[in-house]
Amino acid sequence: MTCQTYNLFVLSVIMIYYGHTASSLNLVQLQDDIDKLKADFNSSHSDVADGGPIIVEKLKNWTERNEKRIILSQIVSMYLEMLENTDKSKPHIKHISEELYTLKNNLPDGVKKVKDIMDLAKLQMNDLRIQRKAANELFSILQKLVDPPSSKRKRSHPQRRCNC
């Protein structure tokens, strides 16, 4: 349980990060609720600092907004899972859970994206059948890397006027 207590700091970061986009969030109340949650988990215990942060560090590798939304979706899901195992009769836990559910509904479903990445990592690239399929798909993959999406192309080209 002590490993989870350090994650409460990350929960604070998520709530603050989305505070500017989710105007309905009352950050002062959430901070108070998170402080109560920290007390529930005894997060001032000395072992919380051992080994450094376990979740905040992961956010450093995700720099673009859409990337961050994917990883934050996963993190919010983790916190919701963590709160499932707590006393939901406490008002502060109920409030934090409600706010996390609201945030989760505004985030993309990162589970599918993470599963796709894991499936790619599991591909046996030394398998001849996989190599054949991969070779067959290589050109279309390269096209996706080189060609900008059609929506960007349309916006980046100025409209041509008819010289009638």
From Swiss-Prot:
Its main location: secreted. Residues 1-19 form the signal peptide. Belongs to the type II (or gamma) interferon family. GO terms for molecular function: cytokine activity; type II interferon receptor binding. The gene is IFNG. Homodimer. Produced by lymphocytes activated by specific antigens or mitogens. IFN-gamma, in addition to having antiviral activity, has important immunoregulatory functions. It is a potent activator of macrophages, it has antiproliferative effects on transformed cells and it can potentiate the antiviral and antitumor effects of the type I interferons. This is Interferon gamma. InterPro entries: 4_helix_cytokine-like_core, Interferon_gamma. Glycans are attached at N42, N61. Pfam families: IFN-gamma. The lineage of its organism: Eukaryota, Metazoa, Chordata, Craniata, Vertebrata. One of its GO terms (cellular component) is extracellular space. Gene3D superfamilies: 1.20.1250.10. It is found in: Secreted. Keywords: Antiviral defense, Cytokine, Glycoprotein, Growth regulation, Secreted, Signal.
